Amino acid sequence: YGYDYIELWGGRPHAYAPDLKAGDINEVRRLIEKYEMPVLGYTPEHNAYPYNYMIGSEAQRRDAIDYLKLSLEMAKEMGAEFVLTSPANGGYLATYDQLWSRLEKNIQELGDYAAKLEIKLVVEALTPYESNFFTRANDLVELFRRVDNPYVVGMCDIVPPFVQHESIMAYFDKLGNKMDHMHIIDGENGSDTHLIPGEGNIPIKEMLYEMKRIGYDKTATLELVTNYINEPRFYAKRAIDNMRELMAEAGIV
């Protein structure tokens, strides 16, 4: 379909980090070489089960951190530039002080390991349907105030700001050179559903025009997630075709 690169999701039976370590990484590298398609980033599943570093006992937190360290290692082996992490729901009894203390500890450790491997750790804010405390650009700003590490950077999935009536473009101003990646998809009010670009309510063409105006030159991927799992090839093709058309209309070649 003409992709420049892909962002690889990891969860069984699909690029799960322990399976990669057990030998599946060789198949991933074979496919990268066969199709001449680099893996830009690796996104291991850890928002709910069985891994979520924001909730549970210390043993459970440690297990999640070790899993993500392994994910960083596997990303490095496949030639990826980053691993994506998103702080999920921290439980309903935790205070903000407790949540922030736990998150700072987690990202500090993962960031130090990312720096050791010389691979970026990209942190993503989620929708309020997915996380009960890390959902806005300001949360990323606060995290970067607490964790000073050039290998820890941020991104914008454009659905979270849209469903919260937050400015998408504010991410660029607030994060500055820490604004390193984007998930560009469409969405609708009242839902965290990710839709094919041009088939929801987000003014993507106008957003692309503004991105061109400010000179955004980092990376972006189309994250369709679970809404189209019945026919992923059909909808992946439609998504990239729609995106090319929107980019052309915005004057991006």
Enumerate the predicted regions with their spans.
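Histidine-acidic metal/acid-base catalytic patches
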Residues: 1-2, 26-29, 33, 79, ...
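N-terminal pre-domain/capping segments
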Residues: 1-80, 108, 115, 149, ...
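Active-site-proximal loop/turn and secondary-structure-junction residues that shape catalytic pockets
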Residues: 10-12, 45-48, 88-91, 125-129, ...
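Short linear motifs at secondary-structure transitions and domain/linker junctions
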Residues: 13-14, 96-97, 129-130, 156-159, ...
